[in-house]
Design a protein with these regions (language model features):
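Bacterial signal peptide processing site
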Residues: 8-10
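Acidic, polar ligand-binding/catalytic clefts
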Residues: 13-24, 112, 121-182
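Extracytoplasmic small-molecule ligand-binding "clamshell" domains
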Residues: 28, 38-42, 46, 50-58, ...
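Short aromatic/hydrophobic contact patches that present stacked aromatics
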Residues: 29-31, 170
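A short, acidic/glycine-rich surface segment
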Residues: 70, 94-97, 152-157
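Long, compositionally biased eukaryotic signaling regions
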Residues: 74-75
Length: 182
């Protein structure tokens, strides 16, 4: 998976190369309400299952290759129903984003499959990123699914599941650059 960012003002055609050194390594996981250890176990079992059977790779390939992303619908929150309430910030494509009323992204497709597996109706609560883990810790949502990097600060609010995605950052430079001084 890659994302390119660049700047420049001339029309000179320049080729680029990737420096094959990971600058950062991050593990993404979901954050579960600390008061729901059984949900944590169910989510970890689910992650293991979709890794093993290839479902996770299929979902990722939709967003990093030429696949067709699937729209995910959210039900309305209703405390009388058996629902899985997901906290997200749908502004981190390809993990979560919106088009109209529909949600898309790796995390959102996983959320739909997880809700189906648990026999629950899916509710997606879209909020500011800083509120995602907090809303789970306050039992307003069951699980945080927002392209979350595992870190100590967030662990104060949620219990992280097993990792489902590894990310790294690399430099992309003009192909004629041969040293870091360039």
């Amino acid at each position: 998976a890659s994302m390119l960012v660049g700047c420049g003002g001339n029309n000179e055609k320049v080729t680029a190369k990737v420096i094959d050194i990971d600058l950062t390594n991050e593990e993404y996981a979901f954050g579960v309400d600390k008061e729901q250890p059984e949900l944590l176990d169910e989510v970890n079992d689910f992650i293991a299952s979709i890794k093993e059977d290839g479902t996770l790779d299929e979902i990722c390939n939709k967003y990093f290759s030429d696949g067709e992303p699937e729209a995910v619908k959210s039900a309305k929150l209703d405390t009388t129903k058996d629902q899985l309430v997901v906290a997200t910030n749908a502004a981190f494509e390809p993990f979560e984003y919106t088009k109209g009323e529909d949600y898309y992204g790796i995390d959102m497709e996983i959320a739909k499959l997880l809700a189906d597996e648990l026999g629950k109706e899916l509710v997606i609560e879209n909020m500011d990123f800083d509120a995602v883990c907090l809303s789970v810790s306050q039992q307003k949502c069951d699980i945080a699914m927002a392209g979350l990097t595992i870190n100590e600060e967030r662990e104060e609010y949620v219990t992280f599941t097993d990792s489902y995605y590894s990310a790294s950052q690399r430099l992309i430079v003009p192909s004629n650059v041969t040293t870091f001084d360039d």
